[in-house]
Regions:
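Negatively charged, low-complexity tracts enriched in Asp/Glu with abundant Ser/Thr
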Residues: 1-39, 122-128
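Acidic, low-complexity, intrinsically disordered interaction modules
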Residues: 41-122
Length: 131
């Protein structure tokens, strides 16, 4: 048997070109999140996009989540952004012991509205239609 055999490799793509472009817009819309939290979103070619989170020098990233559709990526990054904002609001207070929902309920109504309206801002930046 010859050792010079050629193997045909077929590269399967797990994300469509359209979704790749949409995901790029979502990743760009949430750029401020990457500065606030130890999160990095990367285009990994035919595999889609990955969110790397919770970095430690000894072990690298604890969480790696792969996205192949822009809507789930948008919703996940929205929740990360909101949770980060709520954490920052509660930091240094007894509220930090509460869950994110409870922290949100403790906020003044105007602040709640302001936070929720930010989702529409991100959606517009990412060219995503909210449902």
């Amino acid at each position: 048997m010859s050792r010079n055999r050629r193997f045909a490799t077929v590269e399967k793509s797990y994300i469509t070109d359209i979704e790749r472009e949409r995901c790029k817009k979502v990743a760009a819309a949430y750029a401020e999140l990457y500065e606030l939290e130890s999160i990095l979103v990367l285009d990994v070619g035919r595999y889609g996009f990955v969110k790397l989170q919770y970095y430690t020098p000894e072990y690298g990233f604890n969480d790696v989540i792969t996205y192949t559709d822009s809507e789930s990526m948008f919703e996940d990054l929205w929740q990360e952004w909101l949770d980060t904002r709520l954490y920052l609001f509660a930091k240094g207070t007894p509220m930090l012991e509460m869950g994110y929902e409870e922290i949100f309920k403790c906020l003044p109504e105007e602040k709640q509205k302001e936070l929720l309206e930010q989702k529409a801002v991100f959606a517009k930046m990412a060219e995503i239609e909210l449902k």
